[in-house]
Amino acid sequence: MKKLVSILMAAVLLLCAVPVLAEGQTYTVGVCQLVTHDALDAATQGFIDALNEALPGQVKIVEKNASGDSVNCSTIVNGFVSDGVDLIMANATPALTAAASATSDIPILGTSITAYGVALDMDDFTGTVGGNISGTSDLADLE
């Protein structure tokens, strides 16, 4: 259930951005996923499917897997920044942390992030990250 909610939230965030995109333009999206795992794979695939449905033929996806190594996340997202991608999707906390450190200009969507405040070292986190970062959490509502 958490997996489905995360995928749906990522799709909603994406679809909110669609009206501001120029028709006929191609966008490059870098996807950095920490490790191969069923839940992370499903979140990434749901994101890619939503992008391709919303912008058929307009999105080039560059998908990279860090093989469980946070140093690889940094290398991957720094490559995305150097390549000038239009959006970074960071799947898992180390990927988000690396992306946040790599750029304050390129929009970043995080998914499968348990605690944004902890991931981004924000002591005064109120539920909104601000800046160039947004996304979904995999933290279960315990109420």
Residue ranges and their predicted role:
Residues 26-30, 107, 132-135:
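Residues that mark the start of a beta-strand
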Residues 116-143:
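Hydrophobic alpha-helical segments within soluble ligand-binding/sensing domains
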